[in-house]
Amino acid sequence: MNIASGMNQMLAQLKATSDLAAGGNKPAAVAPAASQADFGQLLKSAVDQVNTVQQTANQLSQEFVRGNQDVELHDVMISLQKANVSFQSMIQVRNRLVTAYQEIMNMQV
């Protein structure tokens, strides 16, 4: 599972919960239980993938600094940018989760 599909599933679950809490009387259509993953597992998987990308970029940059002839500068720069993009994406997901939580907490019962 890649990061984007995991994040899309998390956002779909958040939207369904938000719609239900906002007064909808029917839950949104949900994927079959066999393919549906736990929200916590999806979030942990996405964080682990971001962490792996960052560690790989860090290892590549350290190898380049040590003078390893097999590691080229453009490979290091690409891996660092991939790590940056994945981290920024994770920050945006976190921001949306916090916003959704705040909206749910501010709803009147």
From Swiss-Prot:
InterPro entries: FliE
Record's subcellular location: Bacterial flagellum basal body
GO MF annotation list: cytoskeletal motor activity; structural molecule activity
A Gene Ontology biological process term: bacterial-type flagellum-dependent cell motility
Entry keywords, A to Z: Bacterial flagellum
Superkingdom, natural source: Bacteria
Record's GO cellular component terms: bacterial-type flagellum basal body
Similarity remark: Belongs to the FliE family.
Listed name of the protein: Flagellar hook-basal body complex protein FliE
Organism: Nitrosomonas eutropha (strain DSM 101675 / C91 / Nm57)
Upper taxonomic lineage: Bacteria, Pseudomonadati, Pseudomonadota, Betaproteobacteria, Nitrosomonadales
